[in-house]
């Protein structure tokens, strides 16, 4: 059946094969099937055979892209491309390979072996050594072999049935196999170019995910260029997340078939915030070329320049095609065009001398302008040089004289590499902040998507951060230039940034920006759900080349990520610094960075807590509290927990009776303990809360909102997960039995409740308690106006103020005779004194002396011990009630003062009339 398909399959006949109609009576039928030259001479027996034949590989890639998951095959091809690079280029290329195939968020992610995934999760990819990188790539490729083999088998079987693409084009190439190698390779590249162009036109049919389709075409285009195939629009897309095209043309034009020289500059260090010294050289070459206007007119014949010129400006990107505009690739998309007109000839390109004059026509003034903004942010003069000048850690070696480099000790070499990494990553961070500002913040403001005040809350202090980081980068660049690329002293530059007033200002603006991350992401996510126009704007902006295939949600946390890197980099610099004074400066700067990071982390936690409290406040149902007649709950009828500080939260079990328990979610605030019922039992983090007011067995009602000023905790002896929380009001005390999930959680809850309650105690009777910092004054204004609620209002009328103050005074009303608490406490003290005196009398006259042989030695018996413990516990409860009363008195004084100011005019008139009557 395979022979029938091979000889009589529909479609164009394959030249080089004799079409023979074989009848069923032919006795040699089986033998001819076994000797089928189609199987013996197939170019698709293995990936090693097909990956060096561009046209055949294009047919295979199109089949796989439309029928299978193309990630494994593309991963193997790109790994083969990396194997041809030198050590330095391979280390830089591994970053792009990681972000394209290994990263968890990669569009073309492939299954990664567990051992490799574990190492990648715990180590930054740019810090992995070259040997480990090669080992990782080998293991990843080996894990993809099974999938690639299945895809090849499927392609071969479908080809025998005439169901694979481009059979007619491939059949035209087969007569040339083994004849004229140069002519055959030129024809193969020419056919592959046509097939690639067709694949780019049908890009939308590869996948329903537009981003994935573009990534597949980008990866294919890159490997085709590696094989010497001229690419057009694919070059502009390929800068999205793969390899560098900028310098590649100048080098690959020397010898297109030789992959090592061509790929030495394929990877774009600026894509992943890395630089290399060759980048300024390429820029310098382009500037020299741009000064020659003569050959610029020639590129019109290539049919490429007009498209490349239009993609350099940000405002002209086509929102419908996410990957097409990429000004960085304009140079490369033209440079292969110089190679390939010579490739169809019988002889391959001769070398750099024959092609050097052809390189300048491809770099014109227009394209020079479109290419330079990409690495250095569009439309910003001077940024391109700043973006390209920093080198990746291995790159600084090329700027230092070889004799000087050989004489450096190992720790000095390590120090210079870390300093170079600090400079490079700082330049990349500045670029990312400018992308946030230019592509998102400004267009959002101009497009009216958010009010200006709310937009400033989403991107707070962005301009200040750009200014601060740019200044720091300029100082580093200046120091590197002054020192001849071998920086000896950097401590003063670091201290000028992270210490003193500059450090305080940096801490303030970075805290403001980082603390809004959660809020900003929620606001942007909600806006995208509600407004399709905004969603389209974000997607179009994210498709810009400057975004490096990162989404907006990935760019917002960049400042926080940068702050975490500073202490590590500075610590490494200090460890490799020998001079004591310089080392002390660097270590001091590292300590300042750690303090800044600690402050920012705390600000982030506080803001996240505030956002959670706002969510709880929105879900909180206070209806039952408002309907309650309990005077202790009256102050909580309009409870606003967003004014509080969240100390701890978590699920607990509230044991109401021996046989009844309720699952609650407990919020420990700075002065309150809230017991909230979860309605959605399946999810603790997104539930709707409702306050509980159970009254089991007709006893005194247990309140779900409790003040911590009179709180105590005790562990339950019979249950290692349970604990008591004891609250006292007037002459009553209520005990809440709560059960944690583990014993460690119980200890944590007890410690936090005790610590929080202890911080509320008044230190002295005459001293006024220090007011707690209000979150509304420190955190609330940072949110949008819609989240903040109503702003400040004018002073209320006297009647309203009076009623408000009376409502505030209501919680201080206490039933029962005055002085009862003090009398009870005094009685408890006298009882304890009497017990202790009676114990001493029973044990003999006078206090016991050391070495007395009297049995008991003055120690009380079991009955006396139990009685003393009971009296001490009851005395402790009364003392806590007295402390609470003392604190309430201190809080009562300002209310009485305000009430006196309101009532004094009304009381003054009757007093004056009475005095007049007496006179």
Curated annotation (Swiss-Prot):
Biased composition range(s): Low complexity: 775-787
Pfam families: PH_16, RGS-like, RhoGEF
Annotated RGSL domain residues: 39-230
Biased composition (Basic and acidic residues): 281-310
Coiled-coil annotated spans: 864-893
Domain of life: Eukaryota
InterPro entries: DBL_dom_sf (IPR035899), DH_dom (IPR000219), p115RhoGEF_RGS (IPR037887), PH-like_dom_sf (IPR011993), PH_16 (IPR041020), PH_domain (IPR001849), RGS-like_dom (IPR015212), RGS_sf (IPR036305)
Residues with PTM Phosphothreonine: 693
Summary of subunit composition and partner proteins: Interacts with RHOA, GNA12 and GNA13. Homooligomerizes through the coiled coil region. Interacts with CTNNAL1. May interact with CCPG1.
Functional note: Seems to play a role in the regulation of RhoA GTPase by guanine nucleotide-binding alpha-12 (GNA12) and alpha-13 (GNA13) subunits. Acts as a GTPase-activating protein (GAP) for GNA12 and GNA13, and as guanine nucleotide exchange factor (GEF) for RhoA GTPase. Activated G alpha 13/GNA13 stimulates the RhoGEF activity through interaction with the RGS-like domain. This GEF activity is inhibited by binding to activated GNA12. Mediates angiotensin-2-induced RhoA activation.
The protein, known as: Rho guanine nucleotide exchange factor 1
